[in-house]
Amino acid sequence: MLEFVRPLQSILQIKQVNSTDLVWRLHCRVTVFLLLLASLLLSARQYFGNPIDCVIGSGTVSSSTMNEFCWIMGTYISNDPNFVLDSTDLVKINAKIGHIPESERSYQKYYQWVVFILALQACMFSVPNFLWKAWEAGRLQSLCDGLTTPIVPDHWEKTRKKQLITYLSADFPRLHRTYLLRYCFCTLLNFCNVLLNIFLVNVIFSGFWSNYHPAVKALLSFDFPSWNRYNSQVFPKIAKCDFHFVGPSGSKQNRDGLCLLPLNVVNEKIFAFIWLWFLGLLVISMLNLLFWIVVLCSKGFRLWLLTAPLYPIRTSYVARALDGQGVGQWFLLYQLCRNLNPIVGRELVQSVSKAKGHNGHKTFRMPKGGEPDFYTDPEGYDEEGV
């Protein structure tokens, strides 16, 4: 079992420098890990045997042929809820259900596609993270390199400090604003991803969110008889299958079989978790969006967010460091202070505050071709008094 988990360990690996928040990691790491784990688990035949096993009477159709046919063409149950109750007793099935008219059938066409559906969902939840990695391009990692440890490193010296202070004191409104807008876009994309996946599951399983609600409710209340009854209407463990073929004389023949669907024993639990997880993720994502709307609209709230991890630094120092700067500059400082050693973070903000007080506002003239290189040219800006 551990062999399946080992390739996925890197998804949950904790990094020293994180350019994303907890909600983001719930989307792009935890959710992706869980979906891929479920997909790999369902594809492991050594744990569950054949995905379908059909029982037929004696005749010209072999058991293996029937299994392959029903796997490809799909099985069905009756729309009548009593079918699910009777399906736990083979005697009752033979005695009561007989032929099910086409109009009363509910087909399990999803059965062989669940593994791919889960893998597709994992890919969808990975998209915002791939976009952000491409746009962020390791900027925060390079700025925080070696300065995240609990003990202040020896190389936190004048040259290194000057490089960071010079970068933070200069004014790059378009650069930092773009950095923030891309982050907000990916945050919005995470929220849209949840909505899209909820819609996708609802379409594939024909009203999943309403049909599976009684099953999840029964599970949470530990009413296991009701749980078995309701979940079997969506994920039946026993279903019927009809095999049509031409007999020796040319007449149409029909073989109906009773098929066991062992993967649905796992599917019912996976999708009960998905039902709860996606709804919880949707609520958390909505609250996170509201948080960022408040951040973008409230200067006082931004000041408080930046000051909190820098305690006991005075608010006036932080306000001066942000004086004349846009929300993009605040976001960069916020990202740095969340990752840097607290002592280094306080020293940086205090030094930037003093530099602003002494030198006034600094505007950098962006060279063609991208960002400035302060590590090779720490004086690469023009000063303009305001």
UniProtKB/Swiss-Prot annotation:
Extracellular domain ranges by topology: 43-111, 209-272
Membrane topology value: Multi-pass membrane protein
Chain segments carrying region Disordered: 358-386
A matching Pfam family: Innexin
Keyword entries, A-Z: Cell junction, Cell membrane, Gap junction, Ion channel, Ion transport, Membrane, Transmembrane, Transmembrane helix, Transport
Residue ranges, Cytoplasmic side: 1-21, 133-187, 294-386
Parts of the chain that traverse the membrane: 22-42, 112-132, 188-208, 273-293
UniProt biased composition (Acidic residues): 374-386
Entry's localization field: Cell membrane; Cell junction, Gap junction
A GO BP annotation: phototransduction
PROSITE patterns, alphabetized: PANNEXIN
GO cellular component, one term: gap junction
GO molecular function: gap junction channel activity
Disruption-associated phenotype: RNAi-mediated knockdown results in a severe impairment of ovary development. Impairment of testis development. Absence of sperm cells in male gonads. No significant effects on functionality of male accessory gland.
Top-rank lineage group of the source organism: Eukaryota
Family, per entry: Belongs to the pannexin family.
Entries under PANTHER family matching the protein: INNEXIN (PTHR11893), INNEXIN INX4-RELATED (PTHR11893:SF43)
Function, in words: Structural component of gap junctions. Required for normal development of ovary. Required for normal egg production after blood meal. Required for normal development of testis.
Annotated protein name in UniProt: Innexin inx4
